[in-house]
Amino acid sequence: MKKITIAIDGYSSCGKSTMAKDLAREIGYIYIDSGAMYRAVTLYSLQKGFFTERGIDTEALKTAMPDIHISFRLNPETQRPMTFLNDTNVEDAIRSMEVSSHVSPIAALGFVREALVKQQQEMGKAKGIVMDGRDIGTVVFPDAELKIFVTASAAIRAQRRYDELRSKGQEASYEKILENVEERDRIDQTREVSPLRQADDAILLDNSHMSIAEQKKWLTEKFQAAING
């Protein structure tokens, strides 16, 4: 069976990663979480004090980029990928609200996107991958055989994020999360470099009122159609 590239783009907290991980595991493809890569750079920037009262110290971050090494390893117990930053497991750390509230301005930096897009394209050369993010179908893999664009209402996405954080035992405020979701939408859609948009040949999925099982069935059907097409 031929292997293809699957690009899943969409808004923050709309379940892209869960969909992509489940699909990759089911069809035996490699899953690459592009959002985790931007979160890892954000975490590094927070740890190094690159966020100042005047904004991001872009020169310091640009100088540090060659020292930022991001990799993914499979958790043998959960069979889920874990994100490593310079050989340290940061899978939980990059999902914090602090990182969430700082990631969009980092992702809007041209030199950061350029460096990470190159890494992502290298990872996907052999096909047989599922990658989710904001610009996978438009910039990273414009020739992907299957492109999905996922959306859901901001209120529902905020509730999902709130539930996720609470399930991990983290303190969370629904109002602050909703504010963060709406702000990230604004930044993602209006940034100069690779703004969030639906590729012309992407299939739209509004999963506001769909269960995970319904999304999985829908996505599997689209994969089968792409393989047989």
Swiss-Prot record:
Highest rank taxon of the organism: Bacteria
Keywords from the named record: ATP-binding, Cytoplasm, Kinase, Nucleotide-binding, Transferase
GO cellular component: cytosol
CDD domains on file: CMPK
Primary location: cytoplasm
Gene Ontology BP annotations: nucleobase-containing small molecule interconversion; pyrimidine nucleotide metabolic process
Binding-site positions, ATP: G10, Y11, S12, S13, C14, G15, K16, S17, T18
Pfam families listed in its UniProt record: Cytidylate_kin
Enzyme class: transferase
Compartments reported by the entry: Cytoplasm
EC numbers, comma separated: 2.7.4.25
Catalytic reaction list: CMP + ATP = CDP + ADP; dCMP + ATP = dCDP + ADP
MF terms in GO: ATP binding; CMP kinase activity; dCMP kinase activity
Transmembrane segments: none
Family (UniProt): Belongs to the cytidylate kinase family. Type 1 subfamily.
Name the record gives this protein: Cytidylate kinase
Organism annotation: Phocaeicola vulgatus (strain ATCC 8482 / DSM 1447 / JCM 5826 / CCUG 4940 / NBRC 14291 / NCTC 11154) (Bacteroides vulgatus)
The gene coding this protein: cmk
